[in-house]
């Protein structure tokens, strides 16, 4: 394959450049590239990324195993596959996404032709999290490249093996003036956020998201914030309980619960609670093993990313047990391995910290209810979650919940897998996020939608000053009949 000259690999590394040097280099290159980085160049860039990822898949699996023992199959399904799917989807649809759009004519400007054009925002910053460090670095990169931007990626320092590999992959595929990786801790993020990027894409906690938005306000950079929250699951009386249990176990305990759209807690109708709990525990045993020793040995179970997060999760568990929570499954931990086994708790009360903080770990509170209105009120009294899940065979029950709650997305009789749908926007509401990612929505997030109005035979100049008697009459007619 012949690579366009703009994508020829340079014998240089972002490691040898400061954040400011990388930004300035990309700013100059982005200006020079404007209007010239068309569909052929963008698809070539996406092909390079895809080929490099596929060739280095074993290294990706090894890096994530080294960082927090993520299982190989989970890496393929939740880290690599979504990025490759995003690339393929962008390649298939990019011509249509980039195409100028005609806009309906308006009588007030009769004689003109209106349209929309999508231009790159310019130099963009992607700040990636640690929980899905590969997916959430390269997924947004696909959208940014499809839109024609230059990009700086700041991977999380909490997954150092993966961060180093991300830098290596980027340097193999791209020149620094198109895509660069800048590694470092929070101080490096602050240094980057002080620069006047044209768009910032951040994935992380609401607390840090507010800091990112505050920094962006100083340069008036646009932002996409993919945050989090306590995503509730509601199980109705007519739910298929085995199906609900399978989905919840996979959605909650994959990645050891360290997923922004994982079910945070479960509301289950009291009339089916005991039966559901029994099925749920059996499903955990089937997937991960019957006891602590088996779950520790499981090749399909990840670890907590670091000691700080392990201690936070263990503190939530200890607090809940001390205040009367009942352990239905699990409850054991091993600090030496940063291991918290799949844990299900009942008798969870408002006095417990687990009821208020985003868990972001393998603790699953089960909360019984009698009246769905009380559940809806509780959901609406809190911050708007990134996701909400409903398990029910009753369409009226489902539609009532969907209509009366607000969340970034809703999954009905499934959990988490909506992230994989390339034609759906992915994003939150207020505290759980701003803006959308994936597919055309990601493309538009990294694009400026530019309106263009062209005069063909417009008569609007008849309304220009000086405001003679005739012009005033025309203005009066315009206001009267076109308002």
Curated annotation (Swiss-Prot):
NAD(+) binds at residues 204-209. GO terms for cellular component: cytoplasm. Pathway: Hydrocarbon metabolism; alkane degradation. One of its GO terms (biological process) is aldehyde metabolic process. One of its GO terms (molecular function) is aldehyde dehydrogenase (NAD+) activity. Signal peptide: none annotated. It is an enzyme of class 1 (oxidoreductase). It comes from the Bacteria. Keywords: NAD, Oxidoreductase, Plasmid. The keyword NAD applies. The keyword Ligase does not apply. It catalyses: an aldehyde + NAD(+) + H2O = a carboxylate + NADH + 2 H(+). Pfam families: Aldedh (PF00171). Transmembrane segments: none annotated. The active site is at residues 226, 260. Its EC number is 1.2.1.3. Induction: Induced by AlkS. PANTHER family: ALDEHYDE DEHYDROGENASE, ALDEHYDE DEHYDROGENASE ALDX-RELATED. Belongs to the aldehyde dehydrogenase family. This is Aldehyde dehydrogenase. It comes from Ectopseudomonas oleovorans (Pseudomonas oleovorans). The lineage of its organism: Bacteria, Pseudomonadati, Pseudomonadota, Gammaproteobacteria, Pseudomonadales. The gene is alkH.
């Amino acid at each position: 394959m012949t690579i366009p000259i703009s994508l020829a690999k340079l014998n240089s590394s972002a490691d040898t450049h400061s954040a400011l040097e990388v930004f300035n280099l990309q700013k100059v290159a982005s200006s020079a590239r404007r209007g010239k980085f068309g569909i052929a160049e963008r698809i070539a860039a996406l092909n390079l990324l895809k080929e490099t990822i596929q060739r280095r898949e074993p290294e990706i699996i090894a890096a994530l195993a080294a960082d927090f023992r993520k299982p190989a199959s989970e890496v393929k399904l939740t880290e690599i596959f979504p990025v490759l799917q995003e690339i393929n989807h962008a390649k298939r649809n990019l011509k249509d996404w980039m195409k100028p759009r005609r806009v309906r004519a308006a009588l007030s400007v009769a004689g003109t032709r209106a349209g929309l054009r999508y231009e790159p925002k310019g130099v963009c910053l992607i700040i990636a999290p640690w929980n899905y460090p590969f997916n959430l670095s390269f997924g947004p990169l696909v959208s940014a490249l499809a839109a024609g931007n230059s990009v700086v990626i700041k991977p999380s320092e909490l997954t150092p093996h993966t961060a180093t590999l991300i830098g290596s992959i980027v340097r193999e595929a791209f020149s620094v003036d198109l895509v660069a990786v800048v590694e470092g801790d929070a101080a490096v993020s602050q240094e980057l956020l002080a620069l006047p990027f044209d768009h910032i894409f951040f994935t992380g906690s609401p607390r840090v998201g507010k800091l990112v938005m505050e920094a962006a306000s100083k340069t008036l950079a646009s932002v996409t914030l993919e945050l989090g929250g306590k995503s509730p699951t509601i199980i109705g009386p007519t739910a298929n309980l085995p199906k609900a249990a399978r989905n919840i176990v996979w959605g909650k305990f994959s990645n050891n619960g360290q997923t922004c759209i994982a079910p945070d807690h479960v509301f289950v109708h009291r009339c089916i609670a005991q039966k559901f709990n029994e099925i749920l525990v059996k499903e955990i045993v089937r997937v991960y093993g019957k006891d602590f020793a088996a779950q520790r040995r499981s090749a399909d179970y990840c670890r907590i990313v670091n000691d700080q997060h392990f201690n936070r999760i263990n503190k939530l568990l200890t607090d809940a047990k001390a205040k009367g929570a009942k352990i239905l499954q699990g409850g054991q931990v091993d600090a030496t391995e940063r291991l918290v086994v799949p844990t299900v708790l009942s008798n969870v009360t408002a006095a417990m910290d687990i009821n208020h903080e985003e868990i972001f770990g393998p603790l699953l509170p089960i909360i019984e209810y009698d009246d769905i209105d009380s559940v809806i009120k509780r959901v609406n009294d809190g911050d708007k979650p990134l996701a909400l899940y409903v398990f029910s065979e009753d369409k009226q029950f489902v539609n009532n919940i969907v209509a009366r709650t607000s969340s970034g997305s809703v999954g009905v009789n499934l959990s988490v897998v909506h992230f994989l749908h390339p034609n759906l926007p992915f994003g939150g509401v207020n505290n759980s996020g701003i803006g959308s990612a994936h597919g055309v929505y990601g493309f538009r997030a990294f694009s400026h939608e530019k309106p263009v109005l062209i005069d063909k035979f417009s008569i609007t100049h008849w309304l220009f000053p000086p405001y003679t008697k005739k012009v005033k009459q025309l203005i009066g007619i315009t206001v009267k009949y076109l308002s």
